[in-house]
Amino acid sequence: MSSGGLLLLLGLLTLWAELTPVSSRKRHQFCNVPPEPGRCNANVRAFYYNPRLRKCIEFSYGGCGGNANNFKSRGECKRTCAE
């Protein structure tokens, strides 16, 4: 294969990698479930990942129960689900 062909192939692979949405990359499955406030009434500030909007959103967590799409900080949510 010529060097021009290799450059074209490399460029196409790079473009594909950049355009591939996060949802099709390896992401924890729990990042796709809706937020669950839990059964208690503590009203704790928490964050969940919204796959449709591709961002972490604040919600009120009851303090017990719920699911794994529940993070103490927006940064932790982003590191786990959005990167």
UniProtKB/Swiss-Prot annotation:
CDD domains: Kunitz_textilinin-like (cd22594). Expressed by the venom gland. PROSITE patterns: BPTI_KUNITZ_1, BPTI_KUNITZ_2. Residues 31-81 form the BPTI/Kunitz inhibitor domain. Its main location: secreted. Disulfide bonds join C31-C81, C40-C64, C56-C77. The record marks N41, A42 as: Reactive bond for chymotrypsin. One of its GO terms (molecular function) is serine-type endopeptidase inhibitor activity. Binds and inhibits MMP-2 and shows an activity in inhibiting migration and invasion of neuroblastoma. Intact C-terminus is crucial to the activities of this protein. This is Kunitz-type serine protease inhibitor PILP-3. The lineage of its organism: Eukaryota, Metazoa, Chordata, Craniata, Vertebrata.
